[in-house]
């Protein structure tokens, strides 16, 4: 009687087998399964599981678009995705006029006083002070110069330790008639919530330049009399120069991460409309032209419009999905040399992959949803999300979730126990 008797009805599942089964569940089901047991929660919240899950999700990347709304409601994914042609579009409820940066399914929103980091897949949100002193003293008085328009921002993930980091370079003129600005550089570690100073870059890049994170480095494109590409290794936290492709760059050139490769999309208007796509081998830092698409009379007319085009995805058949600054989405089929319009009204943000990597919340972090902030959990005026219901509706919702978890658990047990 001193020893506990084993329950003959219990089923022991090997952790390795359980992990393989859970990896193949939809993300929503995975999140709900965390409350089944401590063992399941520990497994599902491990960095190993998150990395393996993201590797599997990379094979079914989708497109993230803004459900453009300035209602002031919380930023979150719409419940259901939609298809434009055969491309799956995931919509984020947000104000598309505000700047944003994405990396592997996590989004960063830089604001005047705060840096907001959001994982739409898990609904985790963190906010951090911008780390800047907005008041700069000049000889002729006190000027407010530190607005987001005076920053060069970057957001990415350290490929060595997996930490997300935010980079900002601010430019200030401390004296009247000062030719070169004073550059202040800093990096925010999302895990610790702390800012650290960086050594200045070898040269200044355009204020407001969009950043791209590829393979653990953030890149910026500088376009003036000469064009340059600046890179920051997020693990070493060191800047370095990157060679440019052997072609002419236009002021409307867009730099993106296309299938884990640094890409420049160049829109040419003379002698005809052409979209050129150049990709760089990250390790050799050598460029090659991967697409040259004629746009005349298919996408644009001969009228000289302010137009540029940005690639967003490549299908398994090497078909290129791209969009323009007029909210139109296209797909190019190289074999047929054909362009199809998938949507006439869409605000594309970036490629999207579901990501279960947690955003740590530590006592030193500010509360993610301060009162009277733009991120307070409240009802959206656009009526996208249901209002908080009565206690009866809450009980029904809880019962539905419990049943989903029960059926998932039974499916796993059946998958493991049924004879082959």
Curated annotation (Swiss-Prot):
* UniProt entry tagged with the keyword Hydrolase: no
Per the database record, which ranges form the F-box domain? 7-53
| Positions in coiled-coil regions | none
Q: Which UniProt keywords apply?
A: Leucine-rich repeat, Repeat
The source's superkingdom equals Eukaryota
Cysteine disulfide partners in this protein: none
In this record, what's one Pfam family? Answer: F-box
Q: Where are the LRR repeats?
A: 112-135, 226-251
SUPFAM superfamilies to which the protein is assigned, alphabetical: F-box domain, Kelch motif
Name of the protein this chain belongs to: F-box/LRR-repeat protein At2g43260
Q: Which source organism does the UniProt entry give?
A: Arabidopsis thaliana
For this protein's source organism, the top of the classification is: Eukaryota, Viridiplantae, Streptophyta, Embryophyta, Tracheophyta
